[in-house]
Amino acid sequence: MSKQNAPSDLQEHLARLTERGLVTVIGKPINKDTELHPLARWQFQGGLRDEERRAFLFTNVVGAKGEKYDIPVLVGGLAASPEIYAAGLGVPVGDIGKVWVKAMAEPVQPVLVNDGPCQQIVETGDDLKRSGLASLPVPISTPGFDSAPYLTATLCVTKDPDNGIQNMGTYRAALKANDRLGVRMASRLSGAGGYLHWQKYKKLKREMPCAIVVGCAPAVLFTGPQKLAIDVDEMAVAGGLMGAPVRTVRCKTVDLVVPADSEIVIEGLIDTDLLEPEGPFGESHGHVALEDFNMSMRVTAITRKRKPVFLSIVSQVTPSESSVLKKVAYEPMFLEHLRHVLGIRGVTRVVMHEPLTNLRKVIFVQFARGTPRTEVWRGMQGAASLQAQCGKLVIAVSDDIDPENANAIFWSMAYRSDFNTDVLTMPYRSAGHGPKSGRAAEEGTLMIDATLKSVMPPLALPAEEYMRRAHDLWQELDLPRITPQSPWHGYELGDWAPEWTAFAQAAVRGDWRASGENTFARRHGNLKPETPVRGVEKKKD
């Protein structure tokens, strides 16, 4: 694994992305309420490849009523692509999983400092009534459907009143007034750690302190969406991701600590008695979340750097920045669980399907060829049960199938699955993250074994050496740019004989007549056309 060199705050990360040509700066006036997110969304709806996506820095942000903001807005700066995400950890893309596994095993405790850049400017009291949240360039994520501007790239910090352990989660927060937010923390099984804290404060008949961080070191922000175990301090895991302690500072008006190098921190108290209607809002499951009663947060302070950058993420329909944030970390953590917690042999890769299905619903588990069937089924069951919200459909494939290619998955199911014996359903799983309209709270799991269970003839494409030569020839001829799609060459799958290799080699040398002489000598009568040669000649021998 490469040595970690994670940026210490969001602006250092932005500078590094800029140096690598991964930032598009937009100086034209952009309306945060109608234009900003739709423009960034085209990166995901416009057919761009991962490596073509960029972070967008909007430096001339205006509002629907003519407001002008002196704070730039960064969208796509966390995870428009895996490359941008990896830059936030200071490692190559291939090391993302290793960094996460190491951080979970070797967390680094934060250090408390007396003051930090996040408190260079402090707004409290009447200042909040006059401007407060309205002074921030908070975009509307889904214009035409969202009920308000929403904070999306959040770290909502809360603390367990019993043991004092903090939790950081990424939860949406709607602007309600200059000094009030509507906060949604998932109450479902495997939902928000902050919600569990809220339940405890409710029993104590106390308001819940909350600090919402908007922009800080990417490694810290990455912990928010990852659904770490309850009572795991995300700040320590973030230190593991950075390879150094996170500098923290005490909040001004609530008893919480936040990253000292944050861009903006919104402090407040969440009501545990009365809930307020919140939504609609375009959610990461790909549908609009309708109006629900959710938490109401009274803002007690807004602290920030003198020149902060406001951070927002593209969520809603996948692929999105939100799904990349989860995918690049979920997949290695699932693989680590299957291999080293459950001890499953033969598992080589876990891929969570991203387009439209939002990662959580469909999981592909890849196995080495020849893995015992018992291990294949243990692996699928393990993937389906690690998180309550993940694994409605789990499909196992062999290692010649690209699990990122849905067409290859269908091909594997069509030719390698017997739906009498290779399919299993399990009832009573949580419906998880999704639209509520017409859905039951419970649903089932479907598992399909689409691995190679016996030998098969080779894949009917030219052998690799000929396809490689043809690829070079294609480029020499200056034909339209091509991107190889797996499978792009033929390969053996166990059902092949040496004499057929000899025939094929003779054919490409132009010696096909010799093969014809061979087969002429092997003619046979009293047979039906399409009778396999092997069976007849084996009996003859």
What are these regions (language model features)?
Residues 1-541:
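Extended, highly charged
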